[in-house]
Amino acid sequence: MLFGFFRNLFRVLYRVRVTGDARALQGERILITPNHVSFIDGILLALFLPVRPVFAVYSSISQQWYMRWLKSLIDFVPLDPTKPMAIKHLVRLVEQGRPVVIFPEGRISVSGSLMKIYDGAGFVAAKSGATVVPVRIEGAELTHFSRLKGLVKQRFFPRIHLHILPPTHLPMPEAPRARERRKLAGEMLHQIMMEARMAVRPRETLYESLLAAQYRYGAGKNCVEDINFTPDTYRKLLTKTLFVGRILEKYSAQGENIGLMLPNAAISAAVIFGAVSRGRIPAMMNYTAGVKGLTSAITAAEIKTVFTSRQFLEKGKLWHLPEQLTQVRWIYLEDLKADVTLADKLWIFAHLLMPRLAQVKQRPEEAAMILFTSGSEGHPKGVVHSHKSLLANVEQIKTIADFTANDRFMSALPLFHSFGLTVGLLTPLLTGAEVFLYPSPLHYRIVPELVYDRNCTVLFGTSTFLGNYARFANPYDFYRLRYVVAGAEKLQDSTRQLWQDKFGLRVLEGYGVTECAPVVSINVPMAAKPGTVGRILPGMDARLLAVPGIDDGGRLQLKGPNIMNGYLRVEKPGVLEAPAAENALGDVEQGWYDTGDIVRFDENGFVQIQGRAKRFAKIAGEMVSLEMVEQLALGVSPDKMHATAIKSDASKGEALVLFTTDGELTRESLLQYARTHGIPELAVPRDIRYLKQLPLLGSGKPDFVTLKSWVDEPEKQHA
């Protein structure tokens, strides 16, 4: 009777909802593994699961006075993780057919993300041969019974949702020692817990995710700031979003691709969310791509109107772009205020009270954003991402990294770059963190000073940018940083070592591609290995396609919720080319994306990038990575720039051409370094050409198309 009373009470107060297939809990050997977000998690599971399980409760908790009162509701056994017999007792309970609940994290989350997963829980699952049933508890972290005070807006009676996930099994890992088997079992359970979080991620649009963040973290929470040094709260950002969304309707049609050429600023965030709320699809224009690159982008995405700022064009010396790109209409944000009518103001006021009604009807799977590739191997391609793919990548990042509302991001990478958009804007906004948007990553003295002044805890950038920040920064500038993430290019050992020596900070390297929104893998404090780019994110499937001549590794192909909707190409303007990849049998499979990158997985699942498939030369029958050649040159001449191209060779098939800004670099110095570091002599180029400056794309990457055109031309033309 008491049990029924409390169940009805909780159902009324918290509107508890249970979803999933409860039949998964009816087997003979069941181990239930929920996440742990509040002090009432155990009560919720005891009241609403269709079975009466035994709870494994850590002895430090089970000895508390209040546990005696709960004994009538919850059947529990004390668990001391330091005593092997406690683990064996749990194994026996499972083998006897009692459903057992273990909280693998061992403690209530203090970040809102998954905490450390204890190996013991995984070992119990593997040793007992149990069916593992993950359960996700959502909403209890918003109660006053959680440990997230100050990180979320706590409420007395938030809605609580219990998700019962599909059952799985955790086989006993193969390892010579029991300690290693236990550790591997813990890692396998950690993966199961991460996949469970991804399985219940919200299915919503970008605009709905902004509203959800406002609800979760509070409308008065600061969320974005720029060089005006006036932080915007979620409420203020929403107001700007509604204003922009309303006015954009006058210059565009629903479903239209609209160009956005804007700097890193708070208003840019409002324009993005405002556009998507009203069914417009922002195409993020790379203003560093020049007239030629922008013309390709405009053609591929069939853009008719570009929204920009007079002040931005003035400060960036970009007025030549609207003067030359006359095939589109240019709308300036400064002029929009004059278009606001009384009806617009009333509409904005009404939708501040009912913000969900401001969104036009759309589905998460529909197009939300267009980004453009760098064009390093040809014309820039339009990469169409849906609400689903962008938000899935944000959720993947949140699943493995413990970002909280106490964090402050420094975002200097441009928003037209997928790294800058997803990691630099969407992730902090939707995590409750505050982000400082700075318009240029090239200000190597100013960025460190701002990191110090704004108390930033998260910094990310390319290896080049991070190396320069470290050189110009005071040793105390980065005292608050706890995450330093490198992506978009290979992290140089010199940069890694400089950060370690000067600041005592570990740079975490990641890997991504625009087509994957963009993060594919990343090292995090709980799972990091130098020389790799981390493990593939949860929710993604990965496979390697064999490449002739490469024995260790293969071409990486990916499938997952963060994969793009497809390409827009100059050759077929406006026609969406859905992702598809050829498998090992030669069949084309829809939904798979071929990255074109050659990688290998180590025994623990960490990814090592070996180079682009297109950037391998076949010399005397052997495959040589052009990236390895460039790393060789950097080892000899770390302060200069180097890029490698291929030319035909009558005797060996292909030969290497090294372009360098180091006029003193010789084959002899490269040979000496190669022999010392075990690099094959085939990777040492004979043709070394000096350039005062490498041709670069707007992204800062070498322009390999131009370099390839120079290979067969006389060297003097470009020296």
Swiss-Prot record:
Identify the domain of life: Bacteria
Report the SMART domains cross-referenced here: PlsC
Protein localization? Cell inner membrane
Q: How does it sit in the membrane?
A: Multi-pass membrane protein
**GO biological process, any:** phospholipid biosynthetic process
Q: Which reaction does it catalyse?
A: a 2-acyl-sn-glycero-3-phosphoethanolamine + a fatty acyl-[ACP] = a 1,2-diacyl-sn-glycero-3-phosphoethanolamine + holo-[ACP]; a long-chain fatty acid + holo-[ACP] + ATP = a long-chain fatty acyl-[ACP] + AMP + diphosphate
Q: Which Pfam families match?
A: Acyltransferase, AMP-binding
Q: Which GO terms describe its cellular component?
A: plasma membrane
Keywords, A to Z, come to: Acyltransferase, ATP-binding, Cell inner membrane, Cell membrane, Ligase, Membrane, Multifunctional enzyme, Nucleotide-binding, Transferase, Transmembrane, Transmembrane helix
Q: Does the keyword Signal apply?
A: no
Q: Which GO terms describe its molecular function?
A: acyl-[acyl-carrier-protein]-phospholipid O-acyltransferase activity; ATP binding; long-chain fatty acid [acyl-carrier-protein] ligase activity; medium-chain fatty acid-CoA ligase activity
Where is this protein chiefly located? membrane
So what EC number does this one have? 2.3.1.40, 6.2.1.20
In this chain, the stretch annotated as AMP-binding covers 233-646
* Residue ranges crossing the lipid bilayer per the database entry: 258-277, 409-433
Q: Where is this region: Acyltransferase?
A: 15-138
The catalytic residues are: 36
Q: Which family does it belong to?
A: In the N-terminal section; belongs to the 2-acyl-GPE acetyltransferase family. In the C-terminal section; belongs to the ATP-dependent AMP-binding enzyme family.
Give the NCBIfam families listed for this entry: PRK08043.1
Relate the protein's function as given in its record.
Answer: Plays a role in lysophospholipid acylation. Transfers fatty acids to the 1-position via an enzyme-bound acyl-ACP intermediate in the presence of ATP and magnesium. Its physiological function is to regenerate phosphatidylethanolamine from 2-acyl-glycero-3-phosphoethanolamine (2-acyl-GPE) formed by transacylation reactions or degradation by phospholipase A1.
What is this protein identified as? Bifunctional protein Aas
Q: What species was this sequence derived from?
A: Citrobacter koseri (strain ATCC BAA-895 / CDC 4225-83 / SGSC4696)
What is the organism lineage in this UniProt record? Bacteria, Pseudomonadati, Pseudomonadota, Gammaproteobacteria, Enterobacterales
Q: Which gene encodes it?
A: aas
